[in-house]
Amino acid sequence: MSDTGAQVLASYSIKGGVGKTTLAVNLAAEAARTGVRVLLWDLDPQGAATFALRTKAKVSGGAKALVSADGELAPHIRGTDIAGVDVVPADFSLRLLDVHLDERRHPRRRLAALLEPIAGLYDLVLLDCPAGISLASESIIAAADALVVPTIPSALSARTLEQLAGFLEGLDAPPAVWPCWSMVDRRRALQRRSIAELVLQWPDALATAIPMSSDVERMGAERAPVGSYAPRVQATQAFRALWAEIAQRLWT
């Protein structure tokens, strides 16, 4: 249990283009479907989660006001079309989040501190994170109970996970790290072999794999989680199973 009273789950990877936003939006929808009160905080200046949830890309006062000494998260929270899911939208001002965090005392604890006052409002906070390792990443990691790391099975992904592990080794109380296989094509022998090898290195990896799917690719056009427009397809079933697996880890 995190200091906020809600479980804080970050969709995070050093590497870009691995499906972080896809994962965050669909996990939010599946969690809400089971009765979990969800806040999705979009921390990526590209604002893809904000777009997918049909929310205006606006941070009032910009990132500087958000993380200022008297900044509060509650005024930035917006409802969405998905029952049980609220969002803190992103805009392009978040590209300077590192700069504004660096101006604060205890910058690595700032995001966790912003979450504390809304402790009783949500069961789950999902952080949709930009790629890379930065001061903002460190603040995200300090706020999270667990990092779900979408990982396309390959040798490069193994290296990315190793880099993340090396970084976390230097922290006093690092979050759990749960690799999640993303954009998986089971027909590819190389991917199957990569998963088998990575599972040996990362025994806490989530068992459910998210398939490479045209239904997932439609999210940008539909501006919605997959389950809302294609409830019976393989990808929806995978996100549903993945959420069940994560929920069991968070609350048991």
Predicted regions mapped to residue ranges:
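P-loop NTP-binding core
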Residues: M1-T252
